[in-house]
Amino acid sequence: MVYTGDADGRCEIFTWDRSTGTGRQVTDRPHGTLLCAIDADEAVWWFDEDRGGSGRWRTQPFDGGPDRPALTGVPYGRPAGLALGASGTVAVGIRSPEGFGVHLGRPGGAGATVLRTTDSATLCDLAPDGRLLAVSGPAHSARAVTLLAPDGTTVAVLSGTVERTWALGFAPAPAPTPARGPLPVPGRALLLVMRERAGRYHLGTWAPGRGLELLPWCSFATETTARWYPGPGGPRVLLRQDRHGRSRLFTADLDRRELTPVPTPEGSILDAAPAADGDVHVIWTDAVNVPRALSLSGAPLPGQSRWRLPRFGHRQDLWTPGPDGPVHTFVTTPADRSAPHPLVFLVHGGPADHDRDAYDPMVQALVGSGCAVARTNYRGSTGYGPRWRAAYSEGVGHTQVADLVRARADLLERGIGREGAVGLCGTSWGGYLTLLAMGTRPDLWDVGVAVKPLADCVTAFRHSTPALQALDTALFGGTPDEVPDAYAHASPSTYAAAIRSPLLVVAARRDAKCPPEQVEAYLAVLRAGGVAHELMWLDSGHDGYDGADHLAVIRRSLRFLGRGLPAAPVPAEPSPHAERR
C-alpha cells in the first residue's frame, strides 16, 4: 500500500509492505507532498506540485528507484482525478488555464487527450478493461455523470437536474481464474452511483445497455459514500455514513440485497477502504485520539501507534432550536475551571462539510488556555440530510450566521459562555462566516480570526477556478453579472466597515480557492473604514502541506484570541500540531 504520512512536519508519501511489515519514504520535498496512488504493476504514483498547487504526476518503483513522468504530453495543472485500470491503462484529469482535460495512456507513455472542456468536471474512474471512463460534473447539472469511450465519444449521460447524482467508481475486475487469466472481462463495466431522492441518498448501479438502477433497499437519511470490495465473491460495497458528526460503516451485498453494519469504534472515520482479503482499513479519530490507520481485523498497519491525549476538557453535544430543526453544537469546556468561560466558536469550512467527533489541536489549545469551545454544524452542513444541507432560507452566509447567533445565545443562557468574551475563528468558508458575522452582528463578537477566507464574493468569483465558479453560480442562482445583489448581500466586504472588535486576517499568496486578490479588496474596505486589524500573509496555497506554516498560524491565532478575550490567559506554548482545515 501507499499512503501520506508525516515527515518532520511535512506531508510526504510512504510505502508499506504488509507481507514483511516494512515501509519506506518515497518523496522528500521542501513543501510536502499529498496525493498518491499505486497501479496494477505496483508502481507508486505521486503528484509533483508547486506551492500554488499545479504540477504533474510522476511514478517510482514500489521498492525504490528513479522518478519518471507518469504520462508525457499532459499539461501542467491542478489534479482533477486519477484512474488506474486493471488492464494497465491509466487516465489522468488535469485542470489548466485552458480548462479541464482527460488524458489516457500507458504508464510512462504519451497521454492521448480524450476530453477537453471549459466546464467544471472531475475524472471519476476508468473501467477495469479500459473501455469506459466516468467523468463527474456538478451533481445538480444536466451532465452530472458522463460516460466516455477511449476515443472521447459520449456513451451515456446521467442528469442531476431533477435529482442530484454522482458517480463513485467502477466495479473492480473479477478475480483471475486459470481459464481467463488476470485481465478483466471486456464489456462488463458496472458503475456505482449515488442519487438524492425524496430526502434520502440512494445507492444505485449503471451498466451499458441497462442504464441506472437504484437499490431501494439501500438508502440513507444522511450523507453517505461507497467503495467496491475487491477480490472474489459477488458484488459487495463498503458504505461510510456521516451522521450527526460521527461515522458508521455498512457492507451491502448486491446479490443478496443485504445491508449489514460493520462494527467500528465510536468517533469519526475520515476514510475507509476494503482490502482484497475482506478486511477493512480505516483512518479513525475521536476528540482525544489523533487520526490513525486501523485494520478492523486487527492486522498491523503503519501509523497505528496509540497517542491518546490526557483528558483536557468536558465534552457534550448540545442542540439549539432553529427554524429548520435543531442546530447541533459540539461543546468542550475546561475541566478544571468553573463556568462561565470565555467562549470561542471554531467555524468549520465547506460549505459542504461538518464538524465532527474528531481530534482538533485548536480545541485542545483553547480549552487548555481556559476557553470553552463551540463547533456548530449550522444549516448547509453535511451529516444531517439533504434538507439541512440545502437550507439557505435566510440567504447565503446569513443563514449560517443566524445559526451561530442562536447557538451563542443558547450557550450564554446555559451559563457556559459569558457576555463580552465571545470570539470567532474559522478557515476558508469558516473564515468567510467569521468575517460576515463580525460585520453583520458586530455587537455579539469580541474578537475574530479569519484564516484563508472568502472575503469579497465578486472579486473571488473573477479570480477563482471553474469548479468554484460553478459552485458559486449554483449557490447564488447566477454569476455576479446576473445576480449582483445576491453577491453583494452575501459578501463580507459589504459589511467590513461595521466591524468594531479586534480582527486577524490570515491569507495565502498562492491561494486558488480563496484568491489573494479578493482578500486585498476586503482589506481595502477595512482601511477605508478605519477598522483596526492585523494581517498575516503566507507564501503557500490554500491547502499547505508544511507543518511550519500551520504552526505559525496556530501560534498567531491563539495569542490574538487570548488578547481579545478577557480572563483568557495567553498560552505560553500552544499545541504543535497541524492547523484545522
Language-model segments: what does each one mean?
Residues 3, 38, 84, 126, ...:
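Conserved hydrophobic/aromatic "anchor" residues
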Residues 55, 69-71, 79-82, 94, ...:
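Non-catalytic accessory segments flanking enzyme active sites
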